[in-house]
Amino acid sequence: MKRKALNNPLVTEDVRVRFAPSPTGYLHLGGGRTALFNWLFARKHGGVFILRIEDTDMQRSSEEMVQGILDGMHWLGLDPDEGPFFQSSFGEQHRAAAHKLVKEGKAYYDFTPKEASDDRTIKERVIDRARAQVGSAREQNPYRHLAFTEAIRRVEAGEPAAIRLKVPAEGASRFDDLVYGTQERDYSDIEDLVLIRSDGHPLYNLSVVVDDIEMRITHVIRGQDHLTNTHKQVLIYEALGAPVPRFAHLPLIMAPGREKLSKRKHGEVVSVTTYRDRGFVPDALVNFLALLGWSPGTDQEIMSRAELVEMFSLEAVNKSSAIFNFSEKDPRDWTDPKALWMNAEYQRAMALTELVELVAEQLKRFNLWREEYASSEREWLARTVDLLRARYRTTQDFATMGRPYFSDDFEYDPDAIKKNLKDERLKDLLPELADRLALVEDFTHDATESALRAYSEEQGVKAGLLINAARTALTGQAVGPGMFDIVVTLGRPRTVERLKRAAALVP
């Protein structure tokens, strides 16, 4: 397919971008945002969005996690144009690239034996090995200058050897980041990095570069935490004689205490599938994620997917970290309140038929679904969802807060009982009101309201006393939709039964 012409001076070729997660956990919000920004950039410039699973850490990777990533991306509507590809499938290409560099004198075999076990952690030993390869210390490695023929003889004799890249003695690694500007790091600060371990296993920096070259990636869009790796990867690109792609590093997403948002520390609130299961609209979460680190340059916050594509640019990505303001104390605000507000706005604006389908999924998850909702009571379900949609922020709220509309088995809010059922006269008034409503011929909003007000006048009590008490009796709650809308929604039998049942709650 012919790609459309590009008008952005930063884009001079057909765009090919990739999202490259490691399947060591579920798709989290940071990964979801990275995938989204890559997807938006590709769509903006008529490019190709590729999914590559970087599964070379076999001990931590799993099929379950791979499927979790695929499910999360599909739910967000970020299906790739190419892939998924699996990095573990390209091991031979990675090794071939490293051996090519050795033959060209740009890398060397390192026969240094692994350290014997001691009290240091693996991380500490790795750091020590890296320090031994930095700056002038690199020259002290006897294998850096070992004759190629001698190195090959020892390898063919079966002696274990890692392959290291020869970092130039002088100069600096430099690249222009599309978010953070020019980045420079002196070669003396970069170790002769390992490309292939002595057991033949290719390491990350080599694998990712070889894969990006093979997939013709033009722009690498990823988290700021990769900035250090990028200097090393630029060296590998240059050693392989390949074009260096444009880089754009995205600001980190931080928790309220300005610590890095972590799936390990912050749990399910970081998982994309949590938002699916708890009743978010996919486009609402996409909209929210887009604004974590990017701004359209206007006050507009609610944007359709098409508007996001039209407005998105890497130049407008912020340099400062994005704050994800969730609360671990308030179960109602279990995630960022702005995300909940945004989802509520999407729910209110979406077609009722579409919202009903999403609510139906939640009713099934909470065992509240009745087959009649798909047939004879379909119209009732739609009316009920429409009645409640302005009050709820997620579709799960319909099955939790809205449970009294779909089941007779619900809990009464203790505060609502104290507020609305404290008048001892209600012990007699509620059953009598139930009998009066049972006789209403046309069970409509106006007819039931007239019956209640007539009864309150006969008994010499304020209508508000009965209205508030009836709301709690019918829903277990102190607030909600108009009380007579509730009455009509529940219908005559349930209204009468619940009013009588609630008399037992009056002190």
Task: Describe the residue ranges of each PLM region.
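Glycine-rich phosphate/pyrophosphate-binding loops
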Residues: R43-D57, L206-I221, P243-M254, M483-F484, ...
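Catalytic adenosine-cofactor/nucleotide-binding cores of aminoacyl-tRNA synthetases and other
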Residues: G241-Y412, T475-P507
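Residue-level signal for inorganic ion chemistry
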Residues: N38, I69, L101, G105, ...
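C-terminal accessory/binding modules appended to enzymatic or scaffolding proteins
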Residues: V356, K418-L474, V479
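Glycine- and acidic
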Residues: V17-T24, L51-D55, E214-V220, V270, ...
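A generic structural signal for well-ordered alpha-helical surface patches
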Residues: Q67, H231, A306, P431, ...
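Active-site cores that bind ATP or allylic diphosphates and position pyrophosphate for catalysis
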Residues: Y109, K114-H249, M254-K263, S271-V272, ...
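N-terminal Rossmann-like or analogous alpha/beta NTP/dinucleotide-binding catalytic cores
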Residues: K2-A132, N229-A242, A284
